[in-house]
Structures are given as structure tokens and as C-alpha cells.
Amino acid sequence: MNLKQVGRFGENLAVDFLIKHGYEILRTNFRCRLGEIDIIAKEDKTIVFVEVKTRKSLKFGLPSESVNFKKQLHIKKVAEYFIAYHLSQDKYLYRFDVVEIFIDGKNNVTKINLIKDAF
């Protein structure tokens, strides 16, 4: 698999994982002029913006470590756009989670880690 395929594979795994853990998936790969958010979900009355990071090795660190401050600001701006243009006037809480997907050289999942309220 190339990097794009690995990313898509990880996002699909993350969707299944989140559903099994009680999340309602609202959107996947939400795109606007400001950028993209991998998954937008709802857990109870909380809207959750999820960044998915999939890795085959730890050579470049943990997957979540690639969600640096600049990336966090970028995700927050896209989330603000989504909130402004796609949600009703209902009051929601908001949260940013990261899902780490670890796969081996044969594309077998070795671990999925959910980091709630990651930033």
C-alpha cells in the first residue's frame, strides 16, 4: 500500500472502532476551503473532531506526535467552519480526539489507541 492507501485504510478502521465504542459518525473526510478533518462524530451531546494517524513503524515517533501545534490549529479552524455552517443552533460541547492505528508490514492491525480530548 502507498501512503494514501495506508491513510484511507486507517480511517476506515477508525470509523469501525469509533462506532463499536458508541460514537455516531456524522461525516468522514470533511473538506472545505480551509482544509480537511478525517472524521466528525458525536458522542452523547459532544461533537468530536477526530484526526486519524496510521503508522507501520515507530521510526518517526508515535502517530499522535505528528499532530503538532500547527496541525492542531489547522484542525481547529476547519472545525470552526464546520460548526458555523453545518450545525443547527443547538448547544453542543466540542472535543478533539486522535486515533492512532498501528499496523505491521503485512497490513495487520497490531493496536488501535483512542486519545480523547487530545488537544
From Swiss-Prot:
GO molecular function annotation: nucleic acid binding
CDD domains: PoNe_Nuclease
A Pfam cross-reference name: UPF0102
SUPFAM superfamilies per UniProt: Restriction endonuclease-like
Transmembrane segments: none
Xref: InterPro entries: Restrct_endonuc-II-like, tRNA_endonuc-like_dom_sf, UPF0102_YraN-like
NCBIfam families reported for this sequence: PRK12497.1-3 (NF009150), PRK12497.3-3 (NF009154), YraN family protein (TIGR00252)
Family: Belongs to the UPF0102 family.
Protein name: UPF0102 protein Athe_0977
Species for this entry: Caldicellulosiruptor bescii (strain ATCC BAA-1888 / DSM 6725 / KCTC 15123 / Z-1320)
